[in-house]
């Protein structure tokens, strides 16, 4: 979810396979490497220089963090010193994604009931991700392998995890029966994560509230366990006095959380940034990042409401994943803009997927919307992965480090 507080300047470690090594590797590996690499480096020399100078800054502490510190310290002590922090993060993310996809498989419309073990697996997957996402920073400091890449990698994984976590929660409470609520909850989650980094782009400091990521994740784990214990009858039962279904309660909590968080975020954003004349850390308008997330949500809402075949109602999981990948990419670009003190540009290949859906509807669904949704999903995922791999490779090459491996004799501290 929202870039874990225990990141603490953690940044990461290694080189994915780079195209430079193609001449010495198998032809298939060379083709694959080129396929997932952008044709031109995503970051300029000036951005890389400013990235080296970046310092991680955070403020605030959540309610459960002091209580969880003992467990996190114990857990990181069990991790071998040779395991890179980024490897810890990616393992947690993959587990989180896999367990959520189990629910997507059994509940494609978020109205079905999955086997009890699937909800338990999803709860465990989220807890594992939370634990590993927290200790990666501790592992980086413990092994003296903190670099700016790790901070970016951590936030990047969080941006993708957010999409799967909110989707898994909606499936657990069978919110697909209320598509408007499901749409709101999923996009509210990605919007709040984006806003957390938007205010960081403005102020230069990542702020945490008394109720933050850890608390929300524990609440979601409880939702999954309640799905095991109560099942559909529980979510469909009415809350006395309020006379609303129990499944609407988590949605109302999302509304309250969105209002509370956005009030804090926009309080920072509208107060003025640390740049010249109250601008962002990059000297740009404090409102400029809204164009990106605003475009994503506006396109998602228009396509949802204008679909003649009830595309979102019939395929909510595919729909949320498609726009979730788009949101994850623009969030990653916002984090990069913050860390490199550079401007965000609105034109981006991330919008191609949503644009295909929009144009298909404009021409009266010339192609089946379901087919176009799959095309948009695959393209958006590929576009996200291609950007992330390219950025990680470029930064790792620049800092002479590895993404998933700790160099035996390194001077990572030079890049703190």
UniProtKB/Swiss-Prot annotation:
<keyword id="KW-0444">Lipid biosynthesis</keyword>
<feature type="binding site">
    <location>
        <position position="133"/>
    </location>
    <ligand>
        <name>Mg(2+) 2</name>
    </ligand>
</feature>
<feature type="binding site">
    <location>
        <position position="154"/>
    </location>
    <ligand>
        <name>Mg(2+) 1</name>
    </ligand>
</feature>
<comment type="function">
    <text>Catalyzes both phosphatidylcholine and phosphatidylethanolamine biosynthesis from CDP-choline and CDP-ethanolamine, respectively. Involved in protein-dependent process of phospholipid transport to distribute phosphatidyl choline to the lumenal surface. Has a higher cholinephosphotransferase activity than ethanolaminephosphotransferase activity.</text>
</comment>
<dbReference type="GO" id="GO:0004307">
    <property type="term" value="F:ethanolaminephosphotransferase activity"/>
</dbReference>
<feature type="transmembrane region" description="Helical">
    <location>
        <begin position="210"/>
        <end position="230"/>
    </location>
</feature>
<comment type="similarity">
    <text>Belongs to the CDP-alcohol phosphatidyltransferase class-I family.</text>
</comment>
<comment type="pathway">
    <text>Phospholipid metabolism; phosphatidylethanolamine biosynthesis; phosphatidylethanolamine from ethanolamine: step 3/3.</text>
</comment>
<feature type="binding site">
    <location>
        <position position="158"/>
    </location>
    <ligand>
        <name>Mg(2+) 2</name>
    </ligand>
</feature>
<feature type="site" description="Increases basicity of active site His">
    <location>
        <position position="151"/>
    </location>
</feature>
<feature type="binding site">
    <location>
        <position position="86"/>
    </location>
    <ligand>
        <name>CDP-choline</name>
    </ligand>
</feature>
<keyword id="KW-0256">Endoplasmic reticulum</keyword>
<keyword id="KW-0808">Transferase</keyword>
<dbReference type="Pfam" id="PF01066">
    <property type="entry name" value="CDP-OH_P_transf"/>
</dbReference>
<feature type="glycosylation site" description="N-linked (GlcNAc...) asparagine">
    <location>
        <position position="144"/>
    </location>
</feature>
<keyword id="KW-0464">Manganese</keyword>
<protein>
    <recommendedName>
        <fullName>Choline/ethanolaminephosphotransferase 1</fullName>
        <ecNumber>2.7.8.1</ecNumber>
        <ecNumber>2.7.8.2</ecNumber>
        <ecNumber>2.7.8.22</ecNumber>
    </recommendedName>
</protein>
<feature type="transmembrane region" description="Helical">
    <location>
        <begin position="315"/>
        <end position="334"/>
    </location>
</feature>
<comment type="subunit">
    <text>Homodimer.</text>
</comment>
<dbReference type="GO" id="GO:0047359">
    <property type="term" value="F:1-alkenyl-2-acylglycerol choline phosphotransferase activity"/>
</dbReference>
<keyword id="KW-0325">Glycoprotein</keyword>
<dbReference type="GO" id="GO:0031965">
    <property type="term" value="C:nuclear membrane"/>
</dbReference>
<feature type="binding site">
    <location>
        <position position="151"/>
    </location>
    <ligand>
        <name>CDP-choline</name>
    </ligand>
</feature>
<keyword id="KW-1133">Transmembrane helix</keyword>
<keyword id="KW-0460">Magnesium</keyword>
<dbReference type="GO" id="GO:0005789">
    <property type="term" value="C:endoplasmic reticulum membrane"/>
</dbReference>
<feature type="transmembrane region" description="Helical">
    <location>
        <begin position="156"/>
        <end position="176"/>
    </location>
</feature>
<keyword id="KW-0472">Membrane</keyword>
<dbReference type="GO" id="GO:0006646">
    <property type="term" value="P:phosphatidylethanolamine biosynthetic process"/>
</dbReference>
<keyword id="KW-0594">Phospholipid biosynthesis</keyword>
<feature type="transmembrane region" description="Helical">
    <location>
        <begin position="349"/>
        <end position="363"/>
    </location>
</feature>
<keyword id="KW-0812">Transmembrane</keyword>
<dbReference type="GO" id="GO:0046872">
    <property type="term" value="F:metal ion binding"/>
</dbReference>
<comment type="pathway">
    <text>Phospholipid metabolism; phosphatidylcholine biosynthesis; phosphatidylcholine from phosphocholine: step 2/2.</text>
</comment>
<dbReference type="GO" id="GO:0005794">
    <property type="term" value="C:Golgi apparatus"/>
</dbReference>
<keyword id="KW-1208">Phospholipid metabolism</keyword>
<feature type="transmembrane region" description="Helical">
    <location>
        <begin position="116"/>
        <end position="133"/>
    </location>
</feature>
<dbReference type="InterPro" id="IPR043130">
    <property type="entry name" value="CDP-OH_PTrfase_TM_dom"/>
</dbReference>
<feature type="active site" description="Proton acceptor">
    <location>
        <position position="155"/>
    </location>
</feature>
<dbReference type="InterPro" id="IPR000462">
    <property type="entry name" value="CDP-OH_P_trans"/>
</dbReference>
<feature type="transmembrane region" description="Helical">
    <location>
        <begin position="89"/>
        <end position="108"/>
    </location>
</feature>
<feature type="transmembrane region" description="Helical">
    <location>
        <begin position="368"/>
        <end position="388"/>
    </location>
</feature>
């Amino acid at each position: 979810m929202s870039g874990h507080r225990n990141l603490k300047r953690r940044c990461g470690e290694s080189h994915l396979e780079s195209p430079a090594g193609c001449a010495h590797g198998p032809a298939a590996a060379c083709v694959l490497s080129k396929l997932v690499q952008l044709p031109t480096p995503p970051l300029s020399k000036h951005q890389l220089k400013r990235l080296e100078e970046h310092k991680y800054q955070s403020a605030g502490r959540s309610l459960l963090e002091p209580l969880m510190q003992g467990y996190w310290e114990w857990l990181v002590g069990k991790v071998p010193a040779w395991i890179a922090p980024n490897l810890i993060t990616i393992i947690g993310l993959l587990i989180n994604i896999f367990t959520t996809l189990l629910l997507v498989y059994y509940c494609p419309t978020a109205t079905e009931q999955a086997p009890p073990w699937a909800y338990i697996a999803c709860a465990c997957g989220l807890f594992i991700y939370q634990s590993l996402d927290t200790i990666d920073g501790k592992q980086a400091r413990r092994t003296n392998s903190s670099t700016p890449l790790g901070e970016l990698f951590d936030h990047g994984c969080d941006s993708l995890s957010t999409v799967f976590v909110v989707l898994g929660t909606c499936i657990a409470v069978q919110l697909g029966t209320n598509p408007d609520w499901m749409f709101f909850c999923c996009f509210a989650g990605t919007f709040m994560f984006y806003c957390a980094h938007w205010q960081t782009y403005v102020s230069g400091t990542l702020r945490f509230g008394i109720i933050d990521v850890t608390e929300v994740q524990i609440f979601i784990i409880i939702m999954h366990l309640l799905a095991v214990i109560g099942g559909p009858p529980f979510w469909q039962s009415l809350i006395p006095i309020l006379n609303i279904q129990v499944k609407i309660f988590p949605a109302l909590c999302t509304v309250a959380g969105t209002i509370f968080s956005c009030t804090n975020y926009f309080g920072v954003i509208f107060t003025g940034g640390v740049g010249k004349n109250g601008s962002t850390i990059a000297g740009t308008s404090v409102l400029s990042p809204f164009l990106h997330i605003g475009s994503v949500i506006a396109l998602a809402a228009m396509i949802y409401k204008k679909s003649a075949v009830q595309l979102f109602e019939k395929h909510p999981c595919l729909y949320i994943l498609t726009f979730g990948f788009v949101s994850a990419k623009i969030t990653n670009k916002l984090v990069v803009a913050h860390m490199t003190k550079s401007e965000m540009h609105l034109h981006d290949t991330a919008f191609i997927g949503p644009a295909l859906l929009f144009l298909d509807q404009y021409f009266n669904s010339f192609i089946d919307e379901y087919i176009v949704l799959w095309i948009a999903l695959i393209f958006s995922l590929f576009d996200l992965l291609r950007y992330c791999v390219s950025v990680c490779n470029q930064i790792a090459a620049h800092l002479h480090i590895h993404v998933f491996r700790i160099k035996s004799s390194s001077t990572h501290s030079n890049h703190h």
